[in-house]
Amino acid sequence: MIDYTKTLTTTSKNKTFDEGLRRYMLKVYNYMALALLLTGVAAITTISVEPIYHLMFQTGFGTIIMFAPLGIALYFFMGFGRMNLQTAQILFWVYAGLTGMSLSYLALIYTGTSIARTFFICSSVFGAMSLYGYSTSRDLTSMGSFFAMGLIGLIIASLVNLFLKSSSLSFATSLIGIVVFMGLIAWDTQKIKSMYYIAGNDEVGQKLSIMAAFTLYLDFINLFLYLMRFLGNRRD
């Protein structure tokens, strides 16, 4: 005889889990979207407001701003376990704002139309890869490890090209960069989905959603920068 009570209970639990997972992922994407919005506002403000523009591009302060996000990211991920929710949120927003100031130089190199077009293309690619990572039943761990190693190789190649200044190597690293970050978006999304098992509605769960949003934000920004090398139209 079929135990319908047990079946209904299991179905109810699965439904509750699915709804909780959707809320968790929505929170992650909302954090990420707000960070991207803050980045855009910071970039536009830096270019548009004369005192900030002068500070960024005509003083040594701009160099500090350029490297500050790297320090914040290292501190965030290395010290994440020890920091509270408020600190994690503040660091994320500060990082997004400083990144916007750092990337404002793109408006001096590329046309606004091509920047907007690349952003929407990047958003579409990100959405497709994140959806794949969320919905696939395939374990992406091995693929993620491959792309993580590819990222290390990409960093090394980029550093080498600072001295070689090879256009061919630059083209190759840009193309590889697009592929690597497309793969990382899918892998990171799957990891974030699995993080829900240990995330609750307490502060730990809130912190994990911030870290997840930070990770996807970094994937998006890097994919955008590599796409700009191919799709950006330079100003005359």
Swiss-Prot record:
Origin superkingdom: Bacteria
Keyword entries, A-Z: Cell membrane, Membrane, Transmembrane, Transmembrane helix
Membrane-spanning residues: 32-52, 61-81, 90-110, 115-135, 144-164, 167-187, 208-228
Membrane topology label: Multi-pass membrane protein
GO cellular component, one term: plasma membrane
InterPro entries per UniProt: Bax_inhibitor_1-related
Key word Transmembrane present: yes
Stored CDD domains: BI-1-like_bacterial
Transmembrane is among the record's keywords: yes
One Pfam family hit: Bax1-I
Protein family (similarity comment): Belongs to the BI1 family.
Protein name, UniProt field: Uncharacterized protein RP147
Organism: Rickettsia prowazekii (strain Madrid E)
High-level lineage: Bacteria, Pseudomonadati, Pseudomonadota, Alphaproteobacteria, Rickettsiales
